[in-house]
From Swiss-Prot:
Ubl conjugation keyword on record: yes
UniProt cross-link Glycyl lysine isopeptide (Lys-Gly) (interchain with G-Cter in ubiquitin), position: K452
Name assigned to this protein: 26S proteasome regulatory subunit 7 homolog B
Lineage start: Eukaryota, Viridiplantae, Streptophyta, Embryophyta, Tracheophyta
GO cellular component, one term: cytoplasm
Chief location category: cytoplasm
Localization (cell): Cytoplasm; Nucleus
Length: 464
């Protein structure tokens, strides 16, 4: 108690003068023996110098701790405050209960998770090359595992005999190589990306001047898919393919987009130049995977745009630079009409140069119908003007028949350019609507001024 009073005395200046200030108070010391409970008194003068030095050292240690306690406690309190703020922020944001995060700790089941991980081991990819004694209880399967070998194995608990066929990819376990699950065919991602997931916004009502062509294509594509019983009743096979040819801008690709919108079938769009690959055999492989993916669908429409990129007539230039392109075309010929049935697959092809296509590609059985997209007549051009001005802010007294008569030998793309230029004239004059004079100026600019850039006369020479 004496030492504690010395430490807490406010008039004490420090531990350096504790001995001189409180030495008279220490003349008589009373200490209690905690083992016996007796009180022992002795004179401080008889106390050893070492005991007094311990007292002063104890006082100096407490003072030093009090001196250094304040800065560390401030830092600790600051860090604790930041931690509390972050925890409160997390609770306010709801991250702890988010569906994308972990489940609450009370829902964790580490034992079952560990058991599940032990049961679900990764599988090896193999190819089932042969089935021994099919349709029996003792059926065995020959699987070829790449870089490992061939094995005769059975089925696992999760696989069904009706799901396994010869030539398909399967997943086998790493111990007994038993077939666990069937796998889908391996298809290049670049081929899968050719599938049009979203339906285009083009419809048949958005196409003008192609009424006859639309009817011919609908007979080949839509009628066999929507009413196959009509062909079964007559005992005939529907046409399998259509070739659309005509000058640029005549609406070939637009009709294909309208077909994709109209039918609920899977629509795959392929540009001919995409099948021209650097390495030998890559283009033919992509064609095989295209038709393989198309056969896996219930109904599919394959649209080859700019088919003249790979469908040109075969020739020998003595160098062999086009050999790979010709191999790709030969694969297309086989897929169109080979030993394997094409199934419910309709093929549309579009080109600007039908004169350079290989005759084997154009024969009946591969492309049964050829549809020519010629230049629209006066009625067709008038309809195209009305279609493109449907969403424009125009005056009511515009004579579209007059504008159509001023655009002879113009395609739908040319008329669309006229409508855009008329809108640009209205914007330049700071008007909110397009007048007939704007259309007349646009006709002079596009049809008359850009006549030297038009490729229509050049391409029309191939259709005469």
């Amino acid at each position: 108690m004496i030492i504690r009073d010395i430490m807490e005395d406010p008039e004490n200046e420090g531990p350096h003068n504790m001995r001189s200030d409180f030495e008279p108070l220490l003349s008589v010391l009373r200490l209690r023996d905690y083992e016996t409970g007796d009180i022992i008194e002795f004179d401080s003068t008889e106390a050893s110098e070492e005991a007094l030095s311990d007292i002063t050292e104890f006082g100096s240690t407490e003072a030093s701790e009090a001196h250094f306690e304040e800065p560390y406690s401030a830092r600790i309190k600051k860090v604790e405050k930041e931690i509390n703020e972050l925890a409160e922020k997390i609770c306010n944001l709801g991250i702890k209960e988010s569906d994308t995060g972990l489940a609450p700790p009370n829902q964790w089941d580490l034992v079952s998770d560990k058991q599940m991980m032990q049961e679900e081991q990764p599988l090896l990819v193999a190819t089932c090359t042969q089935i021994i004694s099919p349709n029996t209880e003792d059926a065995k399967y020959v699987v070829d595992i790449k870089k490992i070998g061939k094995y005769v194995v059975g089925l696992g608990d999760k696989a069904s005999p009706t799901d396994i066929e010869a030539g398909m990819r399967v997943g086998v376990d790493q111990k007994k190589y038993q077939i666990q699950i069937p796998l889908p065919p391996k298809i290049d991602p670049s081929v899968t990306m050719m599938t049009v997931e979203e339906k285009p916004d083009a419809t048949y009502s958005d196409i003008g001047g192609c009424k006859e062509q639309i009817e011919k294509i609908r007979e080949v594509v839509e009628l066999p898919m929507l009413h196959p019983e009509k062909f079964v009743r007559l005992g005939i096979d529907p046409p399998k393919g259509v070739l659309c040819y005509g000058p640029p801008g005549s609406g070939k690709t637009l009709v294909a987009r309208a077909v994709a919108n109209r039918t609920g079938a899977c629509f795959i769009r392929v540009v001919g130049s995409e099948l021209v690959q650097k390495y030998i055999g890559e283009g033919a492989r992509m064609v095989r995977e295209l038709f393989q993916m198309a056969r896996s669908k219930k109904a599919c429409i394959l649209f080859f745009d700019e088919i003249d990129a790979i469908g040109g007539a075969r020739f020998d230039d003595g160098v062999g630079s086009d050999n790979e392109v010709q191999r790709t075309m030969l694969e297309i010929l086989y897929q169109l009409d080979g030993f394997d049935a094409r199934g419910n697959i309709k093929v549309l092809m579009a080109t600007n140069r039908p004169d350079i296509l290989d005759p084997a590609l154009l024969r009946p059985g591969r492309l049964d119908r050829k549809v020519e997209f010629c230049l629209p007549d006066l009625e067709g051009r008038t309809q195209i003007f009305k279609i493109h001005t449907r969403t424009m802010s125009c005056e009511r007294d515009i004579r579209f028949e007059l504008l159509a008569g001023l655009c002879p030998n113009s395609t739908g793309a040319d008329i669309r350019s006229v409508c855009i230029e008329a809108g640009m004239y209205a914007i330049g004059a700071r008007r909110k609507s397009v007048t007939e004079k704007d259309f007349l100026d646009a006709v002079n600019k596009v049809v008359k001024g850009y006549q030297k850039f038009s490729a229509t006369p050049k391409y029309m020479a191939y259709y005469i």
